[in-house]
């Protein structure tokens, strides 16, 4: 299994992270519950992190802005069995040796860590989740349930499609108008010469919302790779593969 890590997080010695890369073996990108080869991949992932598949959890992901708290009893969801509740795209926990995972193929994986309260989060943020502030919802849940201070929270964005590659239609302007001002939208929507087309910078939109919520600029790590033009990580826009995904994960150690 080829992978990268979020170095700023792993350097804390509090967590281990992972962002799986593409490989010649197409089965390496199979992670969804019930798909052929998925369980074997999770078993290999577990060996890498020193845990069993019953200590790994991820949500089904339906492009919501909802985040849930997970515990050891949720381990194995969407791996050994379907998830017990639906409608969530992110997870928060303070339990050690519970590996939180999300799947992406251009969307933004959001990693959270409060090194003081030792709380982590793993979030899938596509354009819908970003427009509806899923990152902010994660910060608020960490604050409300675990006493985390936004100024203490470290945030990192894993590989995703970058603002120079993500072309969208003008119909996305309206959804982003609910939580973002017109001036803010100008920072991450850039009009193209083609009629009705824009370049959308999801990492910048996420950064703006997190700064508003009290996360410090120096505690936000931007993506180190574009899934579309770097060719290292799964990209639906590039490959049109309905199965292949990048798995991203974080675990308190």
Place the predicted regions along the sequence by residue.
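Active-site microenvironment for binding and transforming phosphate-containing groups
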Residues: 1-253
